[in-house]
Regions:
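Acetyl-CoA-dependent GNAT
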Residues: 3-63, 69, 93, 124-125, ...
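Conserved active-site tyrosine of GNAT-family acetyltransferases
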Residues: 117, 122
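Conserved acetyl-CoA pyrophosphate-binding loop and the N-cap/start of the following alpha-helix
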Residues: 77-89
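Generic leucine side-chain signal with a strong bias for well-ordered alpha-helical environments
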Residues: 8, 68-73, 99, 104, ...
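Hydrophobic alpha-helical segments typical of transmembrane helices
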Residues: 24-25, 67, 86, 90, ...
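Conserved GNAT acetyl-CoA-binding A-motif
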Residues: 87, 94-105
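Active-site acidic-Proline motif in GNAT/NAT acetyltransferases
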Residues: 74-76, 80, 108-109
Length: 136
């Protein structure tokens, strides 16, 4: 999983600390309240990607919601319908788990992802995404 995460972060030149990522992932999978991680396989049982959902509680949306934190497909798997299958899986999983909404963010340049999510029923939410890091 960490190898795929490194590949995913490299797409947009995000910093990647392998030791920290391993530690965070271990912490994440040990606590089901934080979210869920899924590995994706092709028909030949080869690993082709992963999905990370994180959970929070929202008064605005009336309960527990998911944030689709990461959806990654390796380069060989892109353009073959696996992204559509992954989004369908996330939507079905959210319904089964009683999640109120699934939110996500997309890099501005990633038009393919935007079209995928719009075609799968996601809607643009006209708010600004803001970040504050208390460690800095």
């Amino acid at each position: 999983m960490v190898t795929m995460m490194r590949e995913f972060y490299a797409i947009d030149q995000y910093p990647f600390n392998e030791d920290l990522t391993r530690s965070n992932f271990h912490q994440f999978v040990q606590n089901q309240d934080l979210g869920s991680a899924f590995v994706m396989y092709n028909e030949g049982n080869e690993v082709i990607g992963y999905v990370i959902l994180t959970y929070i509680f929202s008064f605005e949306f009336g309960g527990r919601i998911a944030f689709l934190d990461e959806l990654f497909l390796n380069e060989k798997a892109r353009g073959k319908g696996y992204g559509k299958l992954a989004v369908d899986f996330v939507k079905d999983f959210a319904k089964e788990q009683g999640l109120k909404v699934v939110m996500l963010e997309i890099e501005r340049h990633n038009k393919n992802a935007l079209l995928l999510y719009l075609n799968k029923g996601f809607k643009e939410h006209y708010r600004n995404l803001m970040i504050y890091s208390p460690q800095n």
